Amino acid sequence: MGHTINNKTAIVTGASKGVGYATVKLLSESGYKVIAVSRDLSKVSGLVGDNVEVYQMDITNANEIKKFYDKYKDITLDLLVNNAGGGSAPTSIINETMDNFRRAYDINVSGPMYLSQLFVPCMKKSDSATIIFISSLGGKFPYRSGGNYTNAKRGMMALVDTMRLEFPEYGIKVTEICPGTIDTQEEKRDIALTAEDMAESIRWVASLPKHVNINHIEINHILSGK
């Protein structure tokens, strides 16, 4: 098998579907020991195997994040994929609610920040540690009715930029991947990336030499007449 990795450990959030699910499968097939994190264990039970264990956690709940860290605080962590994300249904700013806006930030910014912060000691033990944030082109190019989602993804971009300045002193690389439309269970499009496309990108970033950091990746489907 190509791209085989031995004795590496990864954490993937939002593992119950789409990009997270595909990433857990690909990394485990490549030799990673993967901890797949999801709010709903019933949706990740099919991932359990020799290289995969699952953990139930809500990324918006600080107490649950801390309990998760306490369980795994002694591991050497090589890769953290902050994939859990999302927002409420599309709405205009004039109709936005504080609860939805705050929850979008907790999912996309506050939760991933806290998770990354806690696991720094585990990643410092790795020969080459990487944190990957799955963002969206919507954070760079806001659109009407993007509301809490596009604003939260813009906040994630600022978080990643700050971490990229601060985390190299701990030997940790930080990358943000911004896809366009992804073909998922919720969103079926003829012109869209697949979850597997994203998983391949994540594995590639994680495989780079420790002195090479990819700051930011924008990925789109190629429009073709063929």
PLM feature segments, named:
Residues 116, 152-153:
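Active-site helix of classical SDR
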